[in-house]
Amino acid sequence: MTNFENKEVWFITGSQHLYGEETLRQVANNSKEIVEGLNGSDNVPVKLIHQDTVKSSDEITKVMLDANNSSSCIGVILWMHTFSPAKMWIKGLSIIKKPICHFHTQFNAEIPWSKIDMDFMNLNQSAHGDREFGFIMSRMRKKRKVIVGHWKTEVTQKKVGNWQRVALGWDELQHIKVARIGDNMRQVAVTEGDKVAAQIKFGVEVNAYDSSDVTQHIDKVSDDEVNSLLKKYEKDYDLTDALKDGGDQRQSLVDAAKIELGLRAFLEEGGFMAFTDTFENLGALKQLPGLAVQRLMADGYGFGAEGDWKTAALLRAMKVMAQGMEGGTSFMEDYTNHFTEGKDYVLGSHMLEICPSIADSKPTCEVHPLGIGGKEDPVRLVFNSPKGKALNASLVDMGTRFRLIVNEVEAVEPEADLPNLPVARVLWDPKPDMDTAVTAWILAGGAHHTVYTQALSTEFLEDFADIAGIELLVIDDNTSVRQFKDTLNANEAYYHLFQHGM
């Protein structure tokens, strides 16, 4: 999906010349040991690179410029081992473009009660050094992640690792190219948006292509390639009898394989890591891509149906963040509701395109009619999803800013089998309850398309929104409609002032 080994996070320790060479040598040695310890943790996926201790404005400015200019550096972790007067940091913090993590830790975990003296106190000053540093970043209105805890503890290492994952997702957005195959579904509002503003804000490059750009790759697919992929389908999925070799709809699976091979070749040739399509612009494609899209998502590609490029880009970023973690991440749509006397639920699904990374068992591979698009019956993977904590995330363009909306949910098992539903699905209980959650979602302008994930928590997206400088609205167990409406109104003023530097 993405190679963690090609990326790095710089660990920068602040001090000053006041303390003398011996203290500064100890600061450097301690910093190196912290970096080595974090690099040895399985919870820290991106290699930390120790930088020389910075002790002056010039040194700080230089390392920040170097970080900006490094294509490998995806972020900086800043820690004040001793006191480091914060006015020295103003120029450097003014120019740094990479995500910032302010790490409030200490080399020693405990106070050595019987041995502590002023030498110890002068060396280990992060308790007030980091407060001085925190002030200047708040004074400069710098968005950053603050992590508090001893560097040897697992909980702290996980926090560092999770922030690194968010920085990886952000770095991915700086380089991502999204291919829109066809246009938006006609007359749909929420999938529209300002692609120029998105490129300025996120770095995402979005361009449109015709379905013929894909079909010309399909025409080049060889029989050997198709046969090899068919064998993989037979191994990875439970094929219905109609799709098995000799089945009366085997050709549909052959056509689906050609679509996958051609679409994959198109994406690889163009360097696209996310894409959209729409059933209204299929051209010479024999089927609306279903199986192909599902398998590409499973390989890490971002996808949005009906031209939804914002969800496609967000899905790719979240898949990069979640790489190697337990739980899947998929394109999703709030499809239909289940209102009962007791609990209310939402059934999430789509016409075809749900990622098998969220499957609870080996998917079945089936072919069924599709009443829209005017093409042949498409092949798709069908499955249920596991129960457990999850969230839905929606990125929308509000005209003056981008807004990220997150609803925490609890996936549950369907109350009965769904023998006549020929699509992948997941049933969830929105937090804090159906009434409050959906009311808040609608008030926020949340889309019907989302990214659904069981791998990432809300904290990942909170950190992402801070890095991007975009609005975040969270709907969870603590949400009330009255409070949520107040937040919406307050945010209108805040983001107007924030965007205009007031």
From Swiss-Prot:
Its cofactor is Mn(2+). It is an enzyme of class 5 (isomerase). Keywords: Arabinose catabolism, Carbohydrate metabolism, Isomerase, Manganese, Metal-binding. GO terms for cellular component: cytosol. One of its GO terms (molecular function) is manganese ion binding. Its EC number is 5.3.1.4. Belongs to the arabinose isomerase family. Catalyzes the conversion of L-arabinose to L-ribulose. This is L-arabinose isomerase.
